Amino acid sequence: MSFTSMPSLREQQHPLIRQLADCIEAAWHQHLDLSPYHLPDELGYVEGRLEGEKLTIENRCYQTPQFRKMHLELANIGNMLDILHCVMFPRPQYNLPMFGCDLVGGRGQISAAIADLSPIQLERTLPESYTTALAQLPVLNFSQPRELPEWGNIFSDFCIFVRPGSPEEEAMFLSRVREFLDIHCMQAIASHPVSVEQVTQNLAGQHNYCTKQQQNDKTRRVLEKAFGPVWAENYMTTVLFDLPT
């Protein structure tokens, strides 16, 4: 389906964030049958202040037959910080991993870029069809790889977490995210509903993923400083990483 084009925060952000936001939405529109996913009105576009700087958050959400929620968040804190955050939450009736991607930048540079297709199975492995497709992608060598956080055992062996050191490395990261998205969307379209037992396991896997992601202290601290701990907790658990039911 088509959606009315709206001015986006991405036009004011780092070029890689703008390019990645466009890339994600282009892949979604190309492959999937999108319909709107409605957030509470007060959480779609949010403004606040942090350390004297204006904080702006823009959320766009969709859903499809295979994904209960596809969330693209853009955030900006004056000239200090630019953020892109994206997660595709599968419906538990489908045996699909979690696509996640984040960019963090400030003062004209990207300091962190991460993308992954994270397994939700108890044995922490991706479906074989994913492993086969991802293993065929060329190995990328970045000059400044970064270490995953302590709770990062939710990520797969194909996870990329880097500080892009040049425009060429930014382009490499962008290209790999598009490859992840193409693989993920095509696998989702070809997938079939699973057994009731597998649905229960998928729910448990998504709960684990969301619970671990809610431990991201950096995100929580920024939100608490700008909006207070109650608002931050609500946003973390209803917008960013809501648990499936």
UniProtKB/Swiss-Prot annotation:
GO molecular-function term, one example from the UniProt record: phycocyanobilin:ferredoxin oxidoreductase activity
InterPro entries in alphabetical order: Ferredoxin-dep_bilin_Rdtase, Ferredoxin_bilin_OxRdtase
Pfam families, per the entry: Fe_bilin_red (PF05996)
EC number, UniProt record: 1.3.7.5
Reaction(s) catalysed by this chain's protein: (2R,3Z)-phycocyanobilin + 4 oxidized [2Fe-2S]-[ferredoxin] = biliverdin IXalpha + 4 reduced [2Fe-2S]-[ferredoxin] + 4 H(+)
GO biological process: phytochromobilin biosynthetic process
SS bond list: none
Main enzyme class: oxidoreductase
Keywords: Oxidoreductase
Family under the similarity heading: Belongs to the HY2 family.
Annotated function: Catalyzes the four-electron reduction of biliverdin IX-alpha (2-electron reduction at both the A and D rings); the reaction proceeds via an isolatable 2-electron intermediate, 181,182-dihydrobiliverdin.
This protein's name: Phycocyanobilin:ferredoxin oxidoreductase
Species in which this protein is naturally found: Nostoc punctiforme (strain ATCC 29133 / PCC 73102)
